[in-house]
Curated annotation (Swiss-Prot):
Keyword terms: Hydrolase
SUPFAM superfamilies, per the entry: Metallo-hydrolase/oxidoreductase (SSF56281)
InterPro entries on file: Metallo-B-lactamas (IPR001279), RibonucZ/Hydroxyglut_hydro (IPR036866), UPF0173 (IPR022877), UPF0173_UPF0282_UlaG_hydrolase (IPR050114)
A GO molecular-function annotation: hydrolase activity
UniProt organism field: Listeria monocytogenes serotype 4b (strain CLIP80459)
Protein name as catalogued: UPF0173 metal-dependent hydrolase Lm4b_01588
Pfam family of the protein (one): Lactamase_B_2
Family assignment from sequence similarity: Belongs to the UPF0173 family.
Cystine pairs: none
């Protein structure tokens, strides 16, 4: 399995002949190396409804026929407002089997809304995501602040990789993310959600260096991947 990082919180997971795109903020994202019109994933997974995470989901899903996995409220919005038909609604605490493995949604402390035709639309609760693929557990925290139940996430799902936001201001910053890494006890910690715009400017290498002894961190450059 290969997991690659494409700026902000966009990651791509390739397992066998299946491609999973997570939070595909591509158009308008100078930090992303992908082109929306070239993406043909089998699945798109969304952590929440903010524009810098939903991104190009509608265009990509319509072009590729990808199944969109997300919280039930966001799923309803994408179906009614954008005409998406191939959607797998879920909610926090639930898990579901797919052809590539299992998805479980966890809590996240953030918001989830968009503006459509001049009105603010609430798109349900934000989530984190635990993927179980090829007997590996990958935690994608989404946008969140630090919370103590991250310990429970790590205990229930021994983690091979954890993707954690470090940008501060809208999510936890590097100091809190280092505590999150301590709580989760993942084999590998990868920072995300930083340097896309000035308010979330951070030094990811400094974050990795700050991790507790025994916790391994890795900064993925744009387009770089890891094999697990």
């Amino acid at each position: 399995m290969k997991i690659s990082f494409h700026g902000q919180s966009c990651i791509k997971i390739i397992t066998g002949d299946t491609t999973i795109l997570v939070d595909p903020f591509i158009s308008g994202n100078e930090k992303c190396d992908l082109k929306a019109e070239e993406q043909m994933p089998d699945f798109i997974v969304l952590s929440h409804g903010h524009d810098d995470h939903v991104g190009d989901t509608v265009e990509i899903a319509k072009n590729s026929g990808a199944t969109v996995i997300c919280n039930a409220d966001l799923a309803s919005f994408l179906a009614v407002e954008d005409g998406l038909e191939n959607i797998a609604p879920m909610h926090i605490g639930g898990k579901r089997q797919f052809s590539f493995g299992q998805v479980k949604l966890t809590q996240a402390f953030h918001g989830s809304q968009t503006v459509r035709d001049g009105r603010i639309v609430n798109l349900g609760f934000p989530t984190g995501i635990v993927f179980t693929i090829e007997d590996k557990n990958i935690y994608f925290a989404g946008d969140t602040g630090l919370f103590s139940d991250m310990k429970l996430i790590g205990e229930l799902n021994p983690l091979d990789v954890a993707f954690l936001p470090i940008g501060d201001n809208f999510t936890m910053g590097p100091e809190d993310a280092a505590i999150a890494a301590r709580f989760l006890q993942a084999k590998l910690v990868v920072p995300m959600h930083y340097n896309t715009f000035p308010l979330i400017a951070q030094d990811p290498h400094k974050f990795v260096a700050s991790l507790d002894e025994g916790i391994t961190g890795k900064v993925l450059e744009i387009g770089e991947g890891i094999e697990i």
